[in-house]
Amino acid sequence: MNEKNSLGLDKCFLELDNPILLFTEWYKEAKKTEINDPNALALGTIDEKGYPNVRMVLLKDYGEDGFVFYTNFNSNKGNSIKQNPNISMCFHWKSLLRQIRIVGTAEKVSDEEADNYYKSRSYGSRTGAWASNQSSILKDREELNQSIKKFKDLYKDENNVPRPDHWSGWRLKHHEIEFWLDGENRIHERLKYIKENNDWKKILLSP
């Protein structure tokens, strides 16, 4: 067993019936050990041609109702999710030799929730949400710089930058979560939670 692990998966299999409890414990430890961005995750989506796409985003909230990230809804990822809301996430914490995979369906967060998070962002991030037509082709960097200047001039009051309609959050409503723990000689430990009729079923998987 990985010596860095303070929660053996066999123990969790016996004692933890809710995957969010185990996620919380691992996430707390990742915040202590990861050099930066312990909330970084690989987000998997399917585009309109049926091809998978993966990119890194940041987890901004989570709970029994799902895992939340924010983005431009007109971006490639936003359009993919609108077309096919079946998505996945993967956290990989090298410092802990642990990984968590999450599968579920995306739904838009409420406007109130999006507004509250948007207000917590820096002034530059809020004006940047207006300035960047995410995933579109740029003629050159100066085109983006001019757009940033335009919206900073438009919204000079740092406390009064409205949230764009095209910028909001998605919540992954999870129905599968798998916890992976590095083991010697590639004999890893894997514990999977599967939601069935609002209850969680636990299974151990072969490495």
Predicted regions and their residues:
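Binding-site signature for planar aromatic cofactors or substrates
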Residues: 1-207
